[in-house]
UniProtKB/Swiss-Prot annotation:
Protein name (record): Probable potassium transport system protein Kup
Location (main, coarse): membrane
Organism field: Streptococcus pyogenes serotype M18 (strain MGAS8232)
Domain of life of the source: Bacteria
GO molecular function, one term: potassium ion transmembrane transporter activity
Lineage of the organism: Bacteria, Bacillati, Bacillota, Bacilli, Lactobacillales
Keyword list, A-Z: Cell membrane, Ion transport, Membrane, Potassium, Potassium transport, Symport, Transmembrane, Transmembrane helix, Transport
Gene this chain is encoded by: kup
């Protein structure tokens, strides 16, 4: 990696600062909408809070943001970039060679992050719309929670509906809107604290520790389940590293943290001033002057939509990375935007929409959603901590020191997990069930791939080179295609899937001028696009190894076109002049891609567990994208062949012929 790239990645700019606000901080920036509300409601309402409770709550929020968001994610995790990319799967690719079991925390962390992404839009948008209850002219309408639900669902329908068209056209306003949002949080919070400057004593961690063990705290340590809502967006700082660069996060985070802390302090000051008023509104909206409430609700709704959009886009990226790492089924991916970073996965989009909408309908109020929110993300953070521990060791940190630092964060996060676990019975089971379903699918897909690799038969291409040459020159067979391309999942040295040679020589001899054997390898680097070619001492057999980053589309025909021209220009591959063509001077012949689907033909060697995995994976395949779409072959000539995947050496099954007995009287 060049120094210039590192400098650009670590450099901050005014434009990068604004972009970071719109992309990175949507989730954590909308947490003031519901965190204080959750704390107050779980304490029994505004009338039940005391000054020490409020000081302790704010102190817990400040130090949670400091320990988890600032120290763990901003100061440590952002260093663990994979060629400028962040996120749990990027981190996994950095350390996966250190231990095979690291795939487990990667899958669990990815699954819980996805399940959290389904709940975030429901919580943030509902919280924003509930602010209309504080608007004098609209309060009589939105006191009816059904109207809140309808408005929320309309916004979600529009939000998920526009994903197929790309969001680049509205993405340009995200940064400026979030800058206004954070500025409002900071300014309004500051003015609310002017009458209660004692609230700033909360910076002293004594108040945080005192509250955890104080009898005034009705929930004890379980109050941390509500406190954790303030930092649920911390994982997004790391996941969106590649979009904005480390330097812009370093510069923007202090501004964001200051604004949201001031907002929490402002809400706390309002609670202290109105704890005997009997008002039971969300402290965030109640602390705003009534004449400004409608504008604040509009701004909060925009911020909630931006936060939701960031989670949706992040979910698409997460799933696409999992697919390329071969731990998730293949689904159709499109790129509606002008760059590869803007992707859209229809199946995931509508699953997220269904789960989010059902969440709104099931929980109805943001308060009930908050009761379930945060449980999954504590697990994600724990999994990230495990992977970070290995990363620090890989980077030369002494194992004792790495274990010490990461054990500290693991203990802190486990306490938050324990405190959030009580949410399981109050709706947390929804995200847990969703996360378990995703982990199950990931496990089946990964384990099924390993089983195939374990049993598949491979043959050496060199042993069949002479047969292929004879077939190529045998005019008794019609020319099947000028170029025949086989995509192989396994191609080590000259060993290749038995099924490919079976297709060429046995199933139907395929005479061609050139045989291509292509293997796509996903690299640890996100945006690699390289290849290696081996002509095998011939001009008719070509082994191609494509090295594509885990964030690159696997559009094989486009890459192959470039490779063919490179080989012809270097003289390694003869030109293929076409007698009939509408393109003058065309020197590349026609291509046919042969896709082979291996089906288990004899499962005697499989255990019951392995058989269950293979059968389940086959069922999942029915709803996944075809390999033709995944490899970008929908506009190419493609043949799909089904061949037996032989898992047993038993080639003949005994069978006895029934010989008719002649009539003795005949």
């Amino acid at each position: 990696m060049s120094d210039s790239h590192l400098t650009a990645f670590d450099k901050a700019s005014k434009a990068g600062f604004i972009i970071a606000l719109g992309i990175v901080y949507g989730d954590i920036g909308t947490s003031p909408l519901y965190t204080m509300q959750s704390l107050v409601e779980n304490q029994g309402g505004v009338n039940q809070v005391s000054e020490s409770f409020i000081l302790g709550s704010i102190s817990l929020i400040i130090w949670t943001l400091t320990l988890i968001t600032t120290i763990k994610y901003v100061l440590i995790a952002l260093k663990a970039d994979n060629h400028h990319e962040g996120g749990i799967f990027s981190l996994f690719t950095l350390v996966r060679k250190m231990s095979p079991w690291l795939i487990i925390p990667a899958m669990i962390g990815g699954a819980t992050l996805l399940s959290d992404g389904a709940l975030t839009p429901a919580v943030t948008v509902t919280s924003a719309i509930e602010g209309l209850k504080a608007v004098p002219g609209l309060s009589h309408i939105y006191q009816n929670q059904t109207n809140v639900i309808i408005t929320t669902l309309v916004i979600l329908i529009v939000l998920f509906g526009i994903q197929r068209f790309g969001t680049g056209f509205i993405g340009k306003i995200f940064g400026p809107v979030m800058f206004i949002w954070f500025s409002f949080l900071g300014v309004s919070g500051f003015f609310n604290t002017l009458g209660h400057l004692e609230i700033f004593k909360a910076i002293n961690p004594y108040y945080a520790l005192h509250l955890l063990f104080s009898p005034e705290n009705h929930r004890g340590i379980f109050i941390l389940g509500s406190i954790f809502l303030a930092t649920t967006g911390a994982e997004a700082l790391y996941s969106d590293l590649g979009h904005v660069g480390r330097g812009n996060i370093y510069v923007s985070w202090p501004f964001v943290k200051m604004c949201i802390v001031l907002s929490y302090c402002g809400q706390a000051a309002w609670i202290l001033a109105n704890k005997h008023s009997g008002i039971e509104l969300n402290p965030f909206f109640a602390s705003v002057p009534s004449q400004l409430t409608v504008y604040v609700v509009i701004l909060a709704t925009l911020a909630a939509i931006i936060a939701s959009q960031a989670l949706i886009s992040g979910s698409f990226t997460l799933v696409s990375e999992a697919m390329r790492l071969k731990i998730f089924p293949l689904f159709r991916v499109t790129y509606p935007g002008a760059n590869l970073g803007q992707l859209y996965i229809p199946v995931i989009n509508w699953i997220l929409f269904a789960v989010t909408s059902c969440t709104v309908l099931y929980f109805r109020t943001s308060a009930h959603m908050e009761a379930a929110y945060g449980l999954a993300i504590t697990i994600t953070m724990l999994m990230t901590t495990i992977l970070l521990n290995y990363y620090l060791i890989k980077e030369g940190v002494k194992p004792f020191l790495a274990h010490l630092v990461m054990t500290f964060f693991a203990l802190v996060e486990f306490i938050f997990f324990w405190a959030s676990a009580v949410k399981f019975m109050h709706g947390g089971y929804v995200v847990v069930i969703l996360a378990l379903a995703i982990v199950f699918v990931m496990f089946i897909w990964h384990a099924g791939t390993r089983i195939v690799f374990k049993y598949v038969k491979s043959l050496n291409l060199n042993d069949y080179k002479e047969q292929i040459k004879q077939l190529r020159d045998d005019v008794c067979f019609d020319l099947y295609q000028t170029n025949v391309v086989y995509l192989s999942n396994r191609m080590q040295d000259y060993m290749i899937d038995r099924s490919i040679l079976y297709s060429i020589l046995d199933k139907r001899p395929k005479r061609a001028r050139v045989y291509w054997f292509v293997n796509v390898q996903v690299t640890d680097e996100p945006y690699t696009a390289k290849y290696k070619v081996d002509m095998m001492g011939t001009d008719y057999m070509v082994r191609v190894e494509l090295y594509l980053g885990f964030r690159m589309p696997q559009a094989v025909p486009r890459y192959l076109r470039t490779i063919v021209h490179d080989l012809m220009e270097s003289g390694r591959l003869p030109k293929q002049e076409q007698e009939y063509t509408i393109t003058p001077g065309r020197d590349v012949g026609d291509f046919r891609f042969v896709l082979i689907e291996e089906r288990v033909s004899n499962a005697r060697q499989l255990s019951n567990f392995e058989r269950f995995i293979m059968q389940t994976k086959a069922s999942i395949k029915h709803v996944t994208a075809s390999p033709m779409r995944w490899f970008g072959l929908q506009y190419s000539e493609v043949t799909l062949e089904v061949v037996p995947l032989i898992l047993s050496d038993v080639l003949k099954l005994p069978i006895k012929e029934l010989v008719p007995v002649e009539d003795s009287e005949a």
